[in-house]
């Protein structure tokens, strides 16, 4: 154990003497390496990391995650077609692809829906998506919306023949609209 520390101390001292002024000779200072989302490591990088340059200590490399690993850590996906307007762009991946993550709030609102607080507002129903934990994505529905679409709230749509169910007025009460006759 003592020999390991002695070896590291000797190599570090040699690195300090051989590098001269930190940041010279094309090597990164520790701060420059950190600015690139990297870490100065002795000898080898952790698995799933790559050497993106050398640090100003002899034998030390500036290690960082690969673009794919960085993207995966941010819960994104590398997409060759680029991000959509409902995505958050987390920067480049390999081969010109972009790291994109669907933004649940943008996605909900882009489709004309709203984010509820704990539950959906009146005249809205949850669509099964979450804007964030405890905030469901809700689409407009209910009696007022049903009427604005030319429908009626009836317990049984069979009261109007022929009909289509075009929404929900309340729990168990569909919004029914008569089909236009085509003849």
Curated annotation (Swiss-Prot):
Family designation: Belongs to the beta-defensin family. Helofensin subfamily.
Q: What does this protein do?
A: Lethal toxin which possesses an inhibitory effect on direct electrical stimulation of the isolated hemi-diaphragm of mice. Neither hemorrhagic nor hemolytic activities are detected. Phospholipase A2 activity, proteolytic activity and arginine esterolytic activity are absent.
Superkingdom of the source?
Eukaryota
Segment forming the signal sequence: 1-26
Name the major location: secreted
Q: What is this protein called?
A: Helofensin-1
Where does each C(6)C(4)C(9)C(6)CC repeat begin and end? Answer: 27-64, 65-101, 102-139, 140-177
Tissue expression as described in the entry: Expressed by the mandibular venom gland.
One GO biological process term is:
defense response
User: Short name of one Pfam family for this protein?
Assistant: Defensin_beta
Name the keywords, alphabetized. Repeat, Secreted, Signal, Toxin
Q: Which InterPro entries does UniProt cross-reference here?
A: Defensin_beta-like (IPR001855)
Task: Report the GO molecular function annotations.
Answer: toxin activity
Which cellular components does GO assign to this protein?
Answer: extracellular region
